Amino acid sequence: MVFLKSLSIYMENKPKIAVFGGGSWATAIVKMLSENLDEIGWYMRSVYVLEHIKRNQRNPNYLSSVEFETEKLILSNDINEMVEYADYLIVAIPSAFLQKELDKLTVSLKGKIIFSAIKGIVPESSYIVGEHFHEKYNIPYKDIGVITGPCHAEEVALERLSYLTIASRDEIKAKYIADNLASSYIKTKTSDDIIGTEYAAVLKNIYAIAAGIAHGLGYGDNFQSVLMSNSIREMKRFIKKVHKMKRNINNTAYLGDLLVTGYSVFSRNRMFGNMIGKGYTVKSAMLEMSMVAEGYYATKSAYKLNQKNGAQTPIIDIIYGILYEGKDPKKQFEILVEIID
């Protein structure tokens, strides 16, 4: 009853929420929030896109079928202005570009509540996003949260039934975000495993690249099922090394998110891997794609981190060799076939 009373008071005060990022996932999050809130902050770099949204109620680059009620949107390309506006900052900027955006900050993040919707590792620090804000900006872990799937932005745009896990060590904060994202087509649940869920969101992108490479090389569904089975076991070993706590790796935030990213036609990481399997170089595959494949950057950071931790990660090792050491995908998967079971 104490929790419910506290949450009720919290909801009455309606802390302000802002989304940072202009990509497909940021756009989907703004759509979800707009189902419940009368006012949402939205920061992105592009003045052109902001002006287009104001005039046409749509993001011209991502999920352009989604029509926004622009009277609900507080739009800005000034990151400091948006940080000052909001109590909750939902960060959905690709990890490769996050620090460049944060370098623009002149205002303090003290007292702000940060929820990461980024499925990647920050290259400059090799931290997951929550750790990065904690270590580099002194944000206490009680003010850090994670938004994870299984949930593709494209299906949010189509209003297909989707599921989100909202993780925070403070249940009131997790519930506040969960309630404001929930709708008839979005089901939400909360968790206190901020480290495990975020690492799972990072690792599943690497395994999706593996699934894509396998498909590009001509491996069928039978092998894909074995690959995904081995991927979830590898994920469990990796996460146990970085953060020991009791967790059910078969829950949707871990296994569910892995499966949708590994199998879906909407998965940019699987698409990236598929191109590698078909013979594209890493550089040409990245140039061909209009969206960032977070798994490319995550592979290097996860591989380096595991050199210290020593978990058994043959899939990550193979993908690292292909992406960063120029090893032949066909030969590397012939090796992988003999390792996994």
Regions found by a protein language model. Name each.
Residues 7, 211-215, 240-341:
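NAD(P)-dependent Rossmann-like dehydrogenase/reductase catalytic/cofactor-binding core
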Residues 7-66, 72-77:
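NAD(P)+-binding Rossmann beta1-loop-alpha1 motif at the extreme N-terminus of oxidoreductases
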Residues 121-220:
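Rossmann-fold dinucleotide-binding core
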Residues 70, 74, 79-159, 177-179:
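Rossmann-like NAD(P)(H) cofactor-binding subdomain of soluble oxidoreductases
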Residues 159-164, 195-240, 251-271:
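Active-site-proximal catalytic alpha-helix in oxidoreductases
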